Amino acid sequence: MSAYATQGFNLDDRGRRIVVDPVTRIEGHMRCEVNVDANNVIRNAVSTGTMWRGLEVILKGRDPRDAWAFVERICGVCTGCHALASVRAVENALDIRIPKNAHLIREIMAKTLQVHDHAVHFYHLHALDWVDVMSALKADPKRTSELQQLVSPAHPLSSAGYFRDIQNRLKRFVESGQLGPFMNGYWGSKAYVLPPEANLMAVTHYLEALDLQKEWVKIHTIFGGKNPHPNYLVGGVPCAINLDGIGAASAPVNMERLSFVKARIDEIIEFNKNVYVPDVLAIGTLYKQAGWLYGGGLAATNVLDYGEYPNVAYNKSTDQLPGGAILNGNWDEVFPVDPRDSQQVQEFVSHSWYKYADESVGLHPWDGVTEPNYVLGANTKGTRTRIEQIDESAKYSWIKSPRWRGHAMEVGPLSRYILAYAHARSGNKYAERPKEQLEYSAQMINSAIPKALGLPETQYTLKQLLPSTIGRTLARALESQYCGEMMHSDWHDLVANIRAGDTATANVDKWDPATWPLQAKGVGTVAAPRGALGHWIRIKDGRIENYQCVVPTTWNGSPRDYKGQIGAFEASLMNTPMVNPEQPVEILRTLHSFDPCLACSTHVMSAEGQELTTVKVR
């Protein structure tokens, strides 16, 4: 490949090669390779999906009413979003509208997933890319208490004694030699910039979040029977309502259980307000003060989402996180996105391990083909079963390359918030709350927090702050906060509707396949925790003729396309300086901001390919 320019980036594969394999993700496993120059700045990035999903093939010929139960197993963390996309796709194909109660219950379940997933992502999968756990042992508990009260004065757990107790527990844990999730971190790396007190505060909240998250998912067990993988139903939700029912034999949804749901929603709201959002604002401020605003990639230019959380069911114009597409960083123009339009969403495979008749042409998901074609490029180092270095000039990933009108796009909470901000600036009242959150965050990061900490104030605009690893992490926290607030309204609407006498939870008018047309096609979209999720289905003679999923990591983790355009993962790493390539904190920090999650092994390689060191990636 050597060097070429695309999307405003100058790619150059000369220089030292670093291989991260695997950086796991929910839909399989991901590998990442980068080249760094003499100054340890990333000049080339290659993202590889190393595992074939293949569920689309499994679904062919099956009953479309069962599809949700299969596709839900794509993911065990963002549990439920694939089921929701699937039932929406089938309902769209068969023109089924669900009852109001079912809509509100689905909304509560979807937002529960969002807040749970975002909290687990930040505190347990991503925070340690920002937080030096060992540094927390050096913290002054009194100063930590003062810091807590500066950034979040309403949080009740903020005494010096509380932080001293957590610090002592951490010290005993470290001295035991059994570090568990803290094993093999890059503790002491100069890539970490937080003072000891901020590290102790963050570790403390890591433990608080661990306790709370297990309670929040019980909302799924009430409405969906279990978690992970709660039950869904084409036409509604599989739970009956009886407000006056009591005991185990009563209908699953009664006032006792609804009160339990309300208590969890209140917990979520308080945690987001007093812990999650303040933590991200404080950490983001301190890294911004250190000049670390890297990782923006495609977020600075091209973002996409389908829109979610309608204020009025089946009315996309009332989406409280409105969708669309922004190109070339122009926040003054939002293009409408229609997932049914064959000229808008297309998947390419010129650099993917799949086969099309003509690989210079993209296919709309309704016409998608999932035929594997595992071939390695001539410059690949290693073997078919043990690749040492990818040849990105050839096919190099099990992920296809989705494009919107030919453009590579970033999806996720950051994309949703950039779009919401753009919509609100143009007068969309339903997007006003995200705009308020963003403007408050900018004021806190630029002025309020630096002033409270005795640091110089800054004047960064949202357009400078948001397209970054910090911005991507902040958007998740703000979305979690917003979802908690919307859940509060959903709960009150649900109870009011039931008390008005409506107990319907399913529309079964078209449950019998005899009522279906001989052929139908539909699409279901969801604002999944990691980004824009779409399921496309074709139904023929009562069976699935074709099924395609385009998941968030397909968009973000996509390889190059036939024009050489890089995907969001690859773009986000470009031009990032590394303190020490043998401890690639910066690579993990940015990749984890997309939430590829979970533990994996990292191998750091020299330009000649010999291994320098082996480390564990959280």
From Swiss-Prot:
It is an enzyme of class 1 (oxidoreductase). Its cofactor is Ni(2+). Ni(2+) binds at residues 75, 78, 597, 600. GO terms for molecular function: ferredoxin hydrogenase activity; hydrogenase (acceptor) activity; nickel cation binding. It is a peripheral membrane protein. GO terms for cellular component: plasma membrane. Belongs to the [NiFe]/[NiFeSe] hydrogenase large subunit family. Heterodimer of a large and a small subunit. This enzyme recycles the H(2) produced by nitrogenase to increase the production of ATP and to protect nitrogenase against inhibition or damage by O(2) under carbon- or phosphate-limited conditions. This is Uptake hydrogenase large subunit. It comes from Cupriavidus necator (strain ATCC 17699 / DSM 428 / KCTC 22496 / NCIMB 10442 / H16 / Stanier 337) (Ralstonia eutropha). The gene is hoxG.
